[in-house]
Amino acid sequence: MAEPLLRKTFSRLRGREKLPRKKSDAKERGHPAQRPEPSPPEPEPQAPEGSQAGAEGPSSPEASRSPARGAYLQSLEPSSRRWVLGGAKPAEDTSLGPGVPGTGEPAGEIWYNPIPEEDPRPPAPEPPGPQPGSAESEGLAPQGAAPASPPTKASRTKSPGPARRLSIKMKKLPELRRRLSLRGPRAGRERERAAPAGSVISRYHLDSSVGGPGPAAGPGGTRSPRAGYLSDGDSPERPAGPPSPTSFRPYEVGPAARAPPAALWGRLSLHLYGLGGLRPAPGATPRDLCCLLQVDGEARARTGPLRGGPDFLRLDHTFHLELEAARLLRALVLAWDPGVRRHRPCAQGTVLLPTVFRGCQAQQLAVRLEPQGLLYAKLTLSEQQEAPATAEPRVFGLPLPLLVERERPPGQVPLIIQKCVGQIERRGLRVVGLYRLCGSAAVKKELRDAFERDSAAVCLSEDLYPDINVITGILKDYLRELPTPLITQPLYKVVLEAMARDPPNRVPPTTEGTRGLLSCLPDVERATLTLLLDHLRLVSSFHAYNRMTPQNLAVCFGPVLLPARQAPTRPRARSSGPGLASAVDFKHHIEVLHYLLQSWPDPRLPRQSPDVAPYLRPKRQPPLHLPLADPEVVTRPRGRGGPESPPSNRYAGDWSVCGRDFLPCGRDFLSGPDYDHVTGSDSEDEDEEVGEPRVTGDFEDDFDAPFNPHLNLKDFDALILDLERELSKQINVCL
């Protein structure tokens, strides 16, 4: 950078010294100086002797001590003077000589403008090559440089103070040199010097983003001297301020357009500008706010904590969201609650995406927030995609009668329900948390596709699907996606009436009455619901293992088997919202299904075995018939010295009728010191000695007979009790 400046400086000094000589020489010779055609060995143009002497003058010591140059050096500042004198020697060696071989740069005048806006002359384009017919005083610029056209002789002679203007420019050289040294390496400056453009502004990479706007350029591309800097386009533009609130279109979702049927695919760019109208309560402190963005109920983006202002909160947040079948965009304003140490929603707004981007790709909206506030945002949809072509449903989402008609399964129950229920009852009744846990989503997607292809070919063996939760999840997904729920509106009303008429905790319903509740359903729905209720009743019977009581099963299957909204409810207050109605419906769903499961019989349990109670109850014995021999035997009570048997033994019952099957332990299970066999007494021996007749017959060899002589004490007490019972019947005995 310093070399061209030195060449320019000394060329101007040299031009001032050559001007009188050229005039005198021209008058003497009468013809202008001519220069021969340049040649590679001798690039310096030939001139007369007087001109050559003048050209070599500045390089000699005498020329350096000329009074004009001394005056010029005295006018410079000390730092500029030292810089000019220190760089003069290498400049003389490289630039001020008669010519540099191999470069093709002859010695001549070099014009250079360090400050472009101060030079009123526009830059001229560099000629492609040297022109042989040019004058000697004009000179040739170095290759790759873009000098301005030199001034004419008339302008040079008429200039009142060329030395003064040059000195002013030379004062700026140190600062310009320092700035250019910070721009980059020398190689970068060489590339800029070799650029074909003649504009110093593009060479110095100046930026116009910091300058004020100047007047427009003229037709010739020139600008006024004080028009400011130009820009090369690499510098960033000054960011524009936020748009005014009047440029945003007010937007509010009506109550009848909560669920649009269409969907949207693409990339959504959302820029938040601010929140307005959030007026805190009187005396409340500023709150920490944040904004949460949801797409179809799923949280997708969130801002950091923001300090809420009195009325308006300025935002500058941009989010890029991928949309897949998106319908609703919801913005929630969350406020920090120090009591529970968490954020709570204080306002929310909803945007219907398909209707917003209908016919346009960008919208600036002022979204109305509930209960108060406005959200200023710009929504831009890019890379919009068409809705993917969905295949016709074959199992999931197909009406139940149509699926049964296509598959023709046994029992009018779809194959997917039959196969899933069979596998669950075979290997899942004792699994803890059945129907509560969720299986792998990838495996469920694979099984779902298999059912869509061919339900009859699906095998749910334990080797292929060892996780029973995958099968339970597929069953619940199928029931959830039915167009019409299994428990329809008429059945729902019938069950509610039955619950009000016969509560299960007061009067247990009968089997016929519970099954009769399903008579209002069509055949296919009734068969399918009957199979499911039988299955759920069987699962609840194993609640000791799987912890799935009827109440837990009702919680899992209530929202699946019943519709989302059963009956129109009364209009509620605006503050309650749809959440309260959904909670009430969910509670009713659980109660209805719980009632059905409690009162539903389980036909797959084994039927009750024959009643075993008669074996334990005392039988009504027929009257005792005693076989009488020829000598008539008279039965009379025998006197006892002791008291009668205690009352506890009077109703001990007849143990002799129980038989061997009821007492498998044999005859000796009551053997012990108090139940030894009683032998005959002395009185009996005396009677035998006297010769009284002895009762003989079939009872003598029968060990089970009541008069067996091998009776124990307990049997004897039972026999006495029987005799006393028979005597109390007023039987006439012949004496």
UniProtKB/Swiss-Prot annotation:
Residue spans of biased composition, Gly residues class: 211-221
Sequence ranges of Basic and acidic residues compositional bias: 14-31
Low complexity bias spans: 47-71
Statement: the UniProt record of this protein carries the keyword Cell inner membrane: no
Keyword terms of this UniProt record: GTPase activation, Lipoprotein, Palmitate, Phosphoprotein
Posttranslational modification: Palmitoylated. Probably palmitoylated by ZDHHC3 and ZDHHC7.
Annotated site residues (Arginine finger) in this chain: 436
GO CC terms of this entry: synaptic membrane
Statement: the UniProt record of this protein carries the keyword Chaperone: no
MF term (GO), any: GTPase regulator activity
Pfam families (alphabetical): C2_SYDE, RhoGAP
Segments forming domain Rho-GAP: 398-604
Disulfide bonds: none
Residues covered by the C2 domain: 249-366
Ranges of Pro residues composition bias in the record: 35-46, 122-131
Entries under InterPro entries matching the protein: C2_dom, Rho-GAP_regulator, Rho_GTPase_activation_prot, RhoGAP_dom
UniProt-listed PROSITE patterns: C2 (PS50004), RHOGAP (PS50238)
Domain of life assignment: Eukaryota
Gene3D superfamilies (alphabetical): Rho GTPase activation protein
Phosphoserine: modified positions: 224, 231, 235, 244, 575, 681, 683
Effect on the protein of changing residue 408 to Q: In a pancreatic ductal adenocarcinoma sample; somatic mutation
Region Disordered: start-end pairs: 1-253, 608-651, 674-696
Stated role: GTPase activator for the Rho-type GTPases. As a GCM1 downstream effector, it is involved in placental development and positively regulates trophoblast cells migration. It regulates cytoskeletal remodeling by controlling the activity of Rho GTPases including RHOA, CDC42 and RAC1.
Name of the protein: Rho GTPase-activating protein SYDE1
